[in-house]
Amino acid sequence: MVIDYMFLIVGGFAAFLVAWVNGANNAANAIGSAVGSGMMSIRKALWFTALFDLLGALFFGKFVSITLLRGIVNISIIDDPLIVVIGMITALFSTGLWLIITTLLKIPMSISQAIVGAILGFGLVTVGFSQINWSKVFEIIASWIYLPFVSIVLSIILYRIHSRIVSKPSYLRFIIVYNVFTTCILFTTIFLLLVKTTRITDVFYAFTLSIIISISISLLSTVIIHRILPKNIDYAREFVFKTLLFFSCMAMAFSHGANDVANSAGPLAGIIYIYEQGRIPGDLVDIPFTAILLSGIGISLGIIMWGYRVVETIGEKITTLTIETGFIAQFSGSLTILIVTRLGLPVSTTVAIVGAITG
């Protein structure tokens, strides 16, 4: 059965709506620390965040999208594809309306929890309790619980390391800190993108190539930083940590796009598949690029157009952040989110960054 194109248009609109409100509501996850610490203006931060959110969506968006489309509800037993289409559209619209309300109230809200709940509700109504993949549901819920604690612990560890290093400030120490953290950010991103299976050969290949690429890029940027580093030790310290804060904020934006784009792209992918093929492939291993792109653009536009409304809540009202503590919070949050994204788990970026700031 091939559905009418009007369902595709309505589904695309609903997915774009969720993506747009997602960007407006969760922009603070990426730039709240930078704005709260006074490192960057809101306007400039929003544009950078929109760009890296889109990049994260394009490179990593398929992993969580597949989970939302097929991992929660056993949709293969539904004979009428139109039921799946209506269910996905309903889940998108209900999530979008709830997010509009929370955004108007300036309350940071987890869209992942909202869309998972909506899809779960659709599944319970259409296929019943027995056709819900409860092991995956509990795995997702468990990640919502442990993610903030992981962010807190990582943030505390990094802060203690940072405190020891800056207790005896020197140019060499600042350059080492810069090199180590940029290498970590690059390695994590490249490795998670390259690794395809858990086989030793695949992991070794991804690990080796990631090490080579990340260290090479980091060393090149370190040479550039060394050339432009201010001679005054205090200015040098501020310059290094401002640079690291910028990189970590963009890593957080990248992670946000990678995970949260699925909240729109996953349901939309199901609608696109049914429109084009009349069914959702049983051996689904990919998500249509159009679903990822439309959702990614929606998030970016939401960030640019309305993201300023909740930035102050995360950046300034939770705690007073310095440039250095802001960097630690963003680095911790982005690292944990990117890892669980690669595992295909829809998580709350809001909870992760709040946990990191708390730590």
Predicted segments, located by residue:
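Alpha-helical transmembrane segments and immediately membrane-proximal extracytoplasmic
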Residues: 1-359
